[in-house]
């Protein structure tokens, strides 16, 4: 739990964590008022809150930005004109450089088709990390979310398929690296505790190294 707040009503309190919960009876029971179930209305991972105890007006900060409520948290409005997205990595489409992709902290893999500031949309959920676009075919896109879950699209990002089941038993980083051979975009390498290689654009993968995490630290 990140933090807890109690306002003038001694029976009403809020606890902030991944979910946001509220009690109306002094802590005897708690109701989740912001969680994965309503993440289309308010983001998860809650960190900060300001409360007007007389009006029920709330300002709430989380990994999705700033949200307000006028009824003690029953419903929410997103203040969505604040530029606060944090990118882990970006990728520029070689054939169509106005198309830019980015993996963002807790806010999906997103892209713009025009390069404009108001034209970004999600193509994959979770924490977005690395994205690669085939320089010979803009319809082929690779993107990942946390713990090495790698997806591929062959239709320009309209639909993504999971191609990471080969290493589902491997140890992976929160942000797992993968690269494309600049001479052959069908050849890619993916890093878990060992290195995986595909020469078929991700249809099949084989490990090409042993465990690389137990050697000399240098």
Question: Each predicted region: which residue ranges?
Answer:
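Beta-propeller blade termini and top-face loops
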Residues: 1-218
């Amino acid at each position: 739990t990140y933090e807890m707040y109690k306002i003038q009503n001694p029976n009403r309190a809020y606890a902030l964590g991944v979910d946001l919960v509220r009690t109306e009876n002094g802590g005897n029971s708690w109701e989740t008022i912001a969680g994965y179930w309503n993440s289309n209305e308010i983001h998860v991972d809650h960190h900060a809150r300001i409360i007007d105890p007389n009006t029920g007006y709330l300002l709430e900060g989380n990994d999705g930005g700033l949200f307000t409520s006028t009824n003690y948290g029953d419903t929410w409005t997103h203040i969505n004109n604040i530029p606060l997205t944090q990118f882990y990595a970006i990728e520029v489409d070689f054939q169509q450089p106005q198309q830019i992709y980015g993996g963002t902290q807790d806010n999906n893999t997103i892209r713009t088709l025009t390069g404009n500031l108001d034209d970004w949309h999600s193509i994959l959920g979770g924490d977005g990390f690395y994205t690669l676009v085939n320089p010979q075919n803009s319809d082929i896109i690779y993107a990942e979310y946390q713990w090495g879950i790698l997806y591929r699209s062959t239709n320009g990002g309209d639909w993504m398929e999971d191609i990471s089941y080969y290493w589902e038993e491997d140890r992976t980083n929160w942000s797992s690296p993968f690269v494309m051979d600049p001479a052959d975009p069908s050849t890619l390498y993916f890093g878990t505790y060992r290195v995986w290689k595909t020469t078929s654009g991700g249809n099949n993968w084989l490990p090409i190294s042993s465990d690389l995490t137990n050697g000399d630290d240098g």
